[in-house]
Amino acid sequence: MSYTQPGRDINPRDSVLKVRKTVDFVITGSGKAPQWNQTQWSNLPQAGGKPTGYSTRFKILYSDTGIYCLFNCSDRKITATRNADFLDLYNEDVVEAFFHPDESQPLYFEYELSPLNYELPIMVPNFKGRFYGWRPWNYEGARKTRHATYIEKDGTAVLSWTAEFFIPYSLLTPLPNVPPVKGTRWRANFYRIDYDNGDAEWSWQLTRTNFHDYERFGTLEFD
């Protein structure tokens, strides 16, 4: 997906998000675990497509075992028909998180989750814009993510949807700079795509070409 948004500066290295540490907790999809109260929402501005009036925001925490993410997406129509993991979820409503722990390596982790709670976790080697996603091997036990979603409705009318997920450090093996400790910095970006009226995109940091423009990712600093 490409973006053009006049007036929005591109300053990814100066965009530092502090990530607070937490104890591990249960993923439910509601985002109501008390641990989420430790941190504030960060907004994802709409970056492409027709104006929607929808808001998108996210939270992130880390523990001794992995990374926790929470997205809240206002919406009026859920566009999601794919009913299995590892499909092209980005062709329907989806949220995405990209983590690039070591800038010296053109290798990062991408995670996608649909409103129907189907996932796409992949490792991505990216050589000067040539990239392809690779599925995890032995994806079971302690290497598996935990994820859940929730669609909020008023009667039959959709109001929003929430995505909550946990990515274990063991799944990120053998990426360098993992697990993070206090003071560790990773590059990262967070996105949403919605298909109510064509495709609309939201991004934490504005990229030049597509979601895989890792040189334009923002910075996470673990607290």
Where are the regions a protein language model picked out?
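Structural preference for beta-rich elements and adjacent junctions enriched in aromatics
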Residues: 1-223
